[in-house]
């Protein structure tokens, strides 16, 4: 979950987000080592009188600083490509939910059910109950079963939007006339918050997303009540 004044990433709730966190740490360590090396070299050149500051040609050095960055880029690219393919892979989803962005709310349709759809609007600040989050609560949450592969079909009715839930590692553009898809699977129950992540007009900040991940039995009860 997110915390006030949080500096790091949110706790991972899906396998994809776990992979993204590991990749972030992996890449950050490489950047830290490179920055430390560059800082050390600059400090040495400024403090050591024996440094060759007027060298015009050094084939060995040029070879090293060509091969070494190439190796580093490969070490970054390989895990990145692996995660990219994992994010696009959808194997036998148990449930499909169609999401449409509007100015300025979301519509959801459970395509596996005959008539299960609703709109999701932000709850105004003056109507919030004690303990609810400002600018993040909605009148209709998206209830989904946990530990099951779910396919989200995402599009827009008007302008560009972006459907994003950070703790699940999700961010997919909602484009008018185009149907994008992504997959999600939560490893534990709970409420997961997101927001529209593409500037879409004056009320862009008032398009929250709330996913309520529950056990399958609870989801079946909820869907029966909604029909």
Curated annotation (Swiss-Prot):
Under SUPFAM superfamilies, the record lists: Cupredoxins, Cytochrome c oxidase subunit II-like, transmembrane region
GO biological process entries:
ATP synthesis coupled electron transport
Cellular location(s)? Mitochondrion inner membrane
Q: Which residues lie on this side of the membrane: Mitochondrial intermembrane?
A: 1-14, 88-227
Residues engaged in binding Mg(2+): 198
Q: What Gene Ontology cellular-component terms does the record carry?
A: mitochondrial inner membrane; respiratory chain complex IV
Q: Which PANTHER family match?
A: CYTOCHROME C OXIDASE SUBUNIT 2 (PTHR22888:SF9), CYTOCHROME C OXIDASE, SUBUNIT II (PTHR22888)
Similarity-based family: Belongs to the cytochrome c oxidase subunit 2 family.
Protein's recorded name:
Cytochrome c oxidase subunit 2
Organism per entry: Speothos venaticus
């Amino acid at each position: 979950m997110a915390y006030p004044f949080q500096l790091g990433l949110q706790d991972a709730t899906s396998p994809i987000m776990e992979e993204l966190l590991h990749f972030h740490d992996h890449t950050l360590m490489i950047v830290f080592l490179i920055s430390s090396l560059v800082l050390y070299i600059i400090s040495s050149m400024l403090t050591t009188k024996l440094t060759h500051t007027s060298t015009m040609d050094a084939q060995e050095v040029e070879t090293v600083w060509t091969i070494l960055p190439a190796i580093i880029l490969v070490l970054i690219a390989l895990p990145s490509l692996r995660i990219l393919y994992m994010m696009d892979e959808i194997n036998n989803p148990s449930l499909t939910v169609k999401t449409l962005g509007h100015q300025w709310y979301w519509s959801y349709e459970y395509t596996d059910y005959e008539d299960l759809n609703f709109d999701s609007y932000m709850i105004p600040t003056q109507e919030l109950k004690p303990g609810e989050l400002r600018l993040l609560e909605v009148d209709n949450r998206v209830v989904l079963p946990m530990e099951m592969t779910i396919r989200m079909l995402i599009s827009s009715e008007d302008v560009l939007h972006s459907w994003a839930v950070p703790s699940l590692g999700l961010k997919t553009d909602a484009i008018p006339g185009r149907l994008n898809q992504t997959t999600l699977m939560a490893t534990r129950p709970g409420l997961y918050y997101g927001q529209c992540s593409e500037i879409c007009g004056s009320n862009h900040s008032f398009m929250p997303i709330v996913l309520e991940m529950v056990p399958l039995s609870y989801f079946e009860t909820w869907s029966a009540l909604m029909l």
